[in-house]
Amino acid sequence: MLLSKAEWDKEQLIRNLREEWGIVDEEPDEGDEDVENSDDAVVMRVGNMMLIVTLFHGHIPDNEAEINAENNYMWPEAIEAAKAHKAHIMVAVLGEEEKLLERGKLFTKAMAVCCKQKYATGVYTSGVVFEPRFYEGLADMIKEDELPIFNWIWFGLYRREGGLNGYTLSLIHI
């Protein structure tokens, strides 16, 4: 999640996870107290998975976000949002015991909640930068018991001499 300012509302994030998706830390562990009490990290156990959401103070290195923002032909402002970001939130879901689909759904839910952060300007995932409200809306498919494939797979288009061509990004991980 790209941010225009190096700030987040950690409590809002935790509240939104609970209220929007019913996600709560199922095994509060005193051993993780240092990380969990950090202003820049949220660590939760959800089923057999661990959800980690971390605020990073700084620009994503090597213009990676800007380069990938060029892939979004549906949101011309993606490049400017990527160039202007001052910080970012990284979401990770760990847990080999859980099926990949369940890990993917948890990741998508957490990213959708990050879209509600005050300074959220772009969602950098799947080799592209999405507009936050667009990503959040697509994630709502999960509430209808549908897979959020448009959050997971970018369907790119490009023109060549023979006409319009298509490609996907992130399909290999599904």
What does each model-identified segment do?
Residues 41-47, 129-136, 163-168:
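Noncatalytic linker/hinge segments flanking ATPase motor cores
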Residues 6-79:
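N-terminal low-complexity, intrinsically disordered segments
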